[in-house]
A protein has these predicted regions:
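Anionic-ligand binding patches
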Residues: 12-26, 33-216
Length: 216
């Protein structure tokens, strides 16, 4: 695998804030970690939590993109607001792309992050190829129902043991390629700004900003 493209734009916040100044956006997730990260990346944009009475569709599509679009459409339909939805996960080359869109429930429907990570670690324990990638699909539906979809990707390898206390999901074992060949820190060992500069979710947010700017 090749590393992700170098990061040329540090943050999309100012552009996105100007574009969305007249409308708030609800984030179609119940995952507090995702909501927090999107708020850290898209500073200056008013991102609202999903109302408690809004039901999201099951994430049972075959691709990250389909899941993200389904959630953004549902949140927009229920609230009438612009909506942003993220669907993301990890793909392992040696496992044919698994866990993929099932990343959040890889070890079972109610599995914890630790259980999911431990299962992946056990499946790669005897594999020579430990290359993995984080993939994020970010869907945006504006207040008029117009849709945009972007994806971000970050290549890396899976460490043999978890390290670090930051992040969530598979971060404690994900060693990103973009920090350099002599840096073996996991995503969970990076500070938030370092992580967002190279992460799949950060890249997707920057691409969304560029797409929206180009359409105006």
């Amino acid at each position: 695998m090749t590393p992700c493209d170098p990061v040329r734009v540090a943050r999309p916040s100012d552009k996105l804030a100007r574009l969305m100044a007249l409308e708030r956006a609800v984030v179609a997730t119940r995952n507090e970690h995702k909501l927090r990260e999107l708020r850290e990346i898209l500073t200056g944009v008013e991102l609202l939590p999903l109302p408690a009475d809004v039901e999201l569709p099951r994430e049972d599509a075959e691709t990250f993109a389909e899941n993200a679009l389904d959630k953004a459409r549902a949140a927009h339909a229920a609230t009438g607001l612009a909506a942003i939805a993220d669907d993301s996960g990890i793909v392992a080359s040696a496992l044919g792309g698994r866990p993929g869109p099932r990343s959040a429930r890889y070890a079972g429907p109610d599995a914890t992050d630790e259980e999911n990570l431990n299962l992946l670690l056990s499946e790669l324990a005897d594999k020579d190829d430990r290359s993995v990638a984080y993939v994020a699909a970010l869907a945006y539906v504006d207040a008029d129902g117009n849709e945009k979809l972007v994806e971000g990707r970050c290549e890396g390898t899976l460490a043999e043991q978890p390290r670090g206390t930051g992040g969530f999901g598979y971060d404690p074992a994900f060693v990103p390629a973009d920090t350099g060949p002599d840096d073996d820190r996991t995503m969970a060992e990076l500070d938030p700004d370092e992580k967002h500069a190279i992460s799949h979710r950060g890249r997707a947010a920057r691409r969304l900003a560029e797409v929206l700017v180009s359409k105006r």
